[in-house]
Amino acid sequence: MKMLTVFDPAMCCSTGVCGSDVDQVLVNFSADVQWLKGRGVQIERYNLAHEPMSFVENEKAKAFLEASGAEGLPLLLLDGETVMAGRYPKRAELARWFGIPLEKVGLASTSCCGGKTSCC
């Protein structure tokens, strides 16, 4: 199976739920990472603040930092090749990269509201 390597900018944690500010993009991406792992995808994440040597030891990450600086992160490598930089991918993009079908989420066929129910 393919391998995704994520080089995150310096941050306190990778979940997006750090301190008083919640970064919804990171929250979504963290959920998507767990979704991928649940489907057997191997993922490595490195945080510039906590694992700077991982950036130095990886030629692609090192060259990227030299050219774009930390403000250009995140950097995503798929099997060692750059697939995205500067933003986190959406779940649909991740699914496409790994050939994983997205589950369709549909609307309920009937509503609980109306009629003689008291649910609303």
Swiss-Prot record:
GO biological process: negative regulation of DNA-templated transcription; response to arsenic-containing substance
GO molecular function: DNA binding
Keyword annotations from UniProtKB, A to Z: Arsenical resistance, DNA-binding, Plasmid, Repressor, Transcription, Transcription regulation
The protein's name in its UniProt record: Arsenical resistance operon trans-acting repressor ArsD
Function, in words: Inducer-independent trans-acting repressor of the ars operon.
The species this protein was found in: Escherichia coli
Taxonomic placement: Bacteria, Pseudomonadati, Pseudomonadota, Gammaproteobacteria, Enterobacterales
Domain of life: Bacteria
